[in-house]
Design a protein with these regions (language model features):
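Extended alpha-helical stalk/coiled-coil segments
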Residues: 51, 58, 65, 72, ...
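Short coil/loop "hinge" linkers that interrupt or connect long alpha-helical coiled-coils or helical hairpins
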Residues: 86-140, 195-224
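Hydrophobic packing segments in regular secondary structure
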Residues: 1-41, 168-245, 361-365, 369-373, ...
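Catalytic cysteine-centered active-site loop
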Residues: 249-297
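Long amphipathic alpha-helical coiled-coil segments
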Residues: 131-163, 245
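...with weaker cross-activation on analogous glycine-rich loops/strands in unrelated enzymes
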Residues: 276-330
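Long, contiguous alpha-helical "rod/stalk" segments
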Residues: 30-100, 158-165
Length: 388
């Protein structure tokens, strides 16, 4: 068995199998090599690798979003802490000035005796009122100083915790990135071990499976008996139009455009272009956006795939979606059943349907990127030029 294939067989994260560098004496026989497996087995293995990589990629995206939020929180706390410390310095300066004034004005005479001995008793009374106000000011300064020191201490603690959280998120992100890199290398290694004939057979098998899944999906009546296109909302129309204009751009994990996209990067960017902010990952989009029956789908709605909601696409109408499929592929139009459908969500549930609607015209390159998504390109791997 080649070293390349051995590494592929030992990919625990992708294949769910445990592999050690020194197998026990009674280890199970090695998995059959590519030349020994049927096209169906190869396609199943390859699709499992793709799904595993995409699932980890979406987890990475969620961590990236949390890390961005934590960086912003830490920066805000740092600014507030600097302001609080400046306020404490000012309060300490005021307190010192009042202390010096009080020391300089110290007298052994009681206020009553000072009033009796005053040349102008009324003026002495007025001065007493001024002094009382000054005393109140000193008390307020001391109170501000005490409160400011407490606030500065609290903010310093919060800033320290925010830094620790940011550091932990960055470490988690690196582990997830390394895992995606490994899973994408597994895809590359498997594909590089196949012959031209095997690759062609895989593409044909995938296209046949997709066509069969689409026929069964439409026959089930899941889309309400007819995949006819309903009019979208104005925002949905704008989001779909943006997605269609990205057809032909490469898939790249973690990418949010404008030169490359992953699946949820495309859906988020499309709806942002329409003026609505939606969550970054497919899992968050599924969890947080309004779910709708498939029978109510309209263009611009999001179709979510797989049991763990690890893939997402924009519904185009007529039983089709626009999606960024997976590494090695490009943004394209696909049958809605190209992957197992989990459900659908609507980013603008209160958006009124347009009175008149004309579907977007597909670019000429749409046909060139149709068909199977089998493939892999090193330029789409982690560490390649980042589009974000």
């Amino acid at each position: 068995m080649s070293a390349t294939l051995l590494r592929w067989v030992c990919t625990g994260a992708a294949l769910g199998a445990l592999c050690t560098t020194a197998p026990p004496a009674h280890a199970a026989p090695d998995a059959p090599g590519p030349e020994e497996r049927s096209v169906t087995q190869l396609l199943t293995d390859l699709q499992r690798l793709y799904r595993s990589a995409e699932e980890t990629s979406e987890t990475y995206n969620a961590t990236e979003e949390k890390l961005t939020e934590q960086r912003a929180r830490a920066a805000t706390l740092d600014r507030r802490l600097a302001k609080a410390r400046a306020s404490v310095r000012d309060s300490r300066s005021d307190a010192g000035r009042f202390a010096r004034q009080q020391y300089q004005a110290t007298s052994n005479l009681s206020p009553y005796m000072r009033l009796l001995l005053a040349r102008d008793p009324q003026r002495a009374l007025d001065q007493g009122q001024v002094l009382r106000r000054a005393a109140a000011g000193r008390a307020a300064t001391v109170e501000r100083l005490t409160g400011g020191e407490k606030k500065a201490g609290d903010l310093a603690g919060a800033a320290k915790r925010a830094l620790a959280a940011r550091t932990a998120l960055a470490a988690r992100q690196k582990k997830q990135r390394d895992r995606v890199e490994g899973q994408l290398r597994d895809v590359e290694q498997l594909l590089s071990s196949l012959t031209v004939e095997q690759l062609a057979a895989l593409r044909q098998a995938e296209e046949a499976d997709t066509a069969d899944a689409q026929r069964r999906f439409l026959a089930s009546g899941a889309l309400g008996g007819s995949p006819a296109t309903r009019p979208p909302s104005r925002q949905g129309d704008t989001a779909l139009d943006y997605a269609v204009r990205q057809i032909g751009r490469p898939y790249k994990w973690g990418a949010e455009g404008p030169k490359a996209f992953d699946c949820s990067g495309l859906t988020q960017r499309a709806w942002a272009h329409a003026g609505r902010r939606i969550p970054r990952t497919s899992q968050e989009q599924w969890a947080e956006l309004r779910r709708i029956p498939l029978s109510k789908l309209r263009p611009g709605d999001l179709v979510v795939y797989f049991r763990k909601a690890t893939h997402v696409a924009l519904y185009m109408g007529d039983g089709k979606v626009v999606q960024a499929p997976r590494p090695g592929a490009r943004v394209k139009v696909s049958p809605i059943a190209a992957n197992p459908v989990l459900g659908a969500v609507r980013p603008d549930p209160k958006g009124r349907a347009m009175d008149r609607y004309t579907p977007p015209k597909l670019p000429a390159k749409a046909k060139a990127v149709s068909g199977s998504d089998i493939g892999y390109d090193r330029s789409h791997a982690p560490g390649a030029t980042d589009s974000r």
